[in-house]
From Swiss-Prot:
It comes from the Bacteria. NCBIfam families: murC. Keywords: ATP-binding, Cell cycle, Cell division, Cell shape, Cell wall biogenesis/degradation, Cytoplasm, Ligase, Nucleotide-binding, Peptidoglycan synthesis. This is UDP-N-acetylmuramate--L-alanine ligase. Pathway: Cell wall biogenesis; peptidoglycan biosynthesis. GO terms for molecular function: ATP binding; UDP-N-acetylmuramate-L-alanine ligase activity. It catalyses: UDP-N-acetyl-alpha-D-muramate + L-alanine + ATP = UDP-N-acetyl-alpha-D-muramoyl-L-alanine + ADP + phosphate + H(+).
Length: 469
């Protein structure tokens, strides 16, 4: 298929998305609808996302069937869709052009002269959201594509003008190599997605290829605190901007850091050791200072004023599933977080600990068998800042259970490291356990990239709390 004609509504009038209920796919569907395409899509189950798309005029099919693609001129699919999917298989047998999600996102990015791609093992969604709010405060009218729901834009996608585009850039299966960034942010590089990558060197090489996509007049915004990030900056022929909390050589840094009773950080921003402004964040944790510095560096390079940068960051109150307050029952606060990598867990729990709760209860749902198996030792040491860990069954996502790893093993490993941990397989049992044991003033965190957030929702719905003496 001719790549330049992908976004021509005269050539491909009807685009069908397999897995349209996914956070990225739904956003891309909205963008194509806005560009004048007829859009349809299918998913295995209906959701709030698919309902929202239907209201916008997108035809949604529940379940996958050959019939769903009968009018399609182009079929878009995700990495999670297998080759034997009936819709994908039928499209190929009929000669209907097919396209993976990352290629489509890259082609959309091509349309914008100033495209920002935010990469890193952790912090992508938060940083993309921060950058988006700063650009909105700066009246740049960006088109935004986020891997989470941001209340300020009413979801995960915003259609703006044809100049600025902001999106996350995920390294899984090297999909970000299909992007066309003018400015690339690299927040950190750690071992993850080991069902695809061989080792950390393989991952670093993918990030190196990614930042080499930036043109000579473009920018790479890189974390100077991360040695893996620093190691790939050699032989990159574009403007390099660094940020960091612990590196004296970073261009953008922070000092006078303090935290209020909610764990929200206040700090002074420095550029080349010169004090620029003071920021008061409305999200907890020192890791969010680093995300804020990355956002400041990126937006300043794009010409945003310090005044608008400050306004944007101070208006950011978080996104859904990132330390999201779900509710309070019997003076027990329930928070949900997307953390599913050891470093993310550590950062989230460190932020939670700064809130001075009597006890922190962490309900963790491991995400994928390969990640749990390969990072088992790191996971077992990641819960130092919680009082009790409840491990539920592994969320398989795209994988099959080979029997090599189980949540019981992780719970045992955590106990071996001196932490109080138990394995409870079902959500109902976890809710009953929390009702009997959590006390007023405590914090409950549901944590993981699957559906563990339902535990918190079930806990809050059940008003029959058991009194704890």
């Amino acid at each position: 298929m001719e790549q330049l004609s992908i976004l021509d509504p005269n050539k491909f009038k009807h685009v069908h998305f397999i897995g349209i209920g996914g956070i990225s796919m739904s956003g891309l569907a909205e963008i194509l609808l806005n560009l004048g395409f007829t859009v349809s899509g299918s998913d295995i189950r209906s959701s709030n996302i698919t309902s929202k798309l239907e209201k916008k005029g997108i035809k949604i099919y529940t379940g996958h069937s050959e019939e769903n693609i009968k009018d399609a001129d182009l079929v878009v699919y995700t990495a999670a869709v297998k080759s034997d999917n009936p819709e994908l298989a039928k499209a190929k047998s009929l000669g209907i052009p097919t396209l993976d999600r990352a290629t489509l996102l890259g082609e959309i990015m091509k349309k914008y002269p100033f495209s920002v791609a935010v990469s890193g093992t952790h912090g992508k969604t938060t940083t993309t959201s921060m950058i988006s709010l700063i650009m909105l405060k700066s009246a740049l009218d960006p088109t935004i594509h986020i891997g989470g729901e941001l209340d300020a834009i009413g979801g995960n996608t915003r259609i703006g003008s044809n100049k600025y585009f902001v999106a996350e850039a995920c390294e899984y299966v090297e999909s970000f190599l299909k992007f066309h960034p003018y400015l690339a942010v690299v927040l950190n590089i750690e071992a993850d997605h080991l069902d695809y990558f061989k080792d950390i060197e393989h991952i670093k090489n993918a990030f190196l290829k990614f930042i080499r996509l930036v043109p000579e007049n473009g920018y790479v915004v890189a974390c100077a605190d991360d040695q893996n990030v620093l190691s790939i900056l050699k032989d990159v022929h574009c403007n390099i901007i660094t940020f960091g909390l612990n590196s004296k050589n970073a261009m953008w840094t922070a000092e006078d850091i303090s935290f209020n009773e909610n764990g929200f950080a206040a700090f002074t921003v420095l550029k080349d050791n010169e004090r620029i402004t003071n920021i008061q964040l409305k999200v907890p944790g020192i890791h969010n200072i680093s995300n804020a510095l990355a956002s400041i560096a990126a937006c300043y390079a794009l010409g945003c004023s310090i005044e608008n940068i400050k306004k944007g960051l101070e208006s950011y109150t978080g996104i859904h599933r990132r330390f999201e307050l779900k509710g309070i029952e019997n003076n027990i606060k329930v928070v949900d977080d997307y953390a599913h990598h050891p470093s993310e867990i550590k950062a989230t729990l460190k932020a939670a600990r700064s809130g001075n709760y009597p006890r922190i209860w962490t309900v963790f749902q491991p995400h994928t068998y390969t990640r749990t198996k390969f990072l088992l030792d790191e996971f077992s040491k990641a819960f130092k800042d919680t009082d009790k860990v409840i491990i539920t069954d592994i969320y398989s996502a795209r994988e099959k259970d080979t029997g090599e790893i189980h949540s019981r093993i992780l719970a045992e490993k955590i106990r071996e490291n001196g932490q109080d941990a138990i394995y409870l397989p079902d959500f109902e049992g976890i809710v009953e356990y929390l009702k009997k044991n959590a006390s007023p003033g405590d914090l409950i965190i549901t944590m993981g990239a699957g559906d563990v957030y339902k535990v918190g929702e079930m806990f809050l719905k059940d008003k029959q709390m058991v009194a704890v003496s």
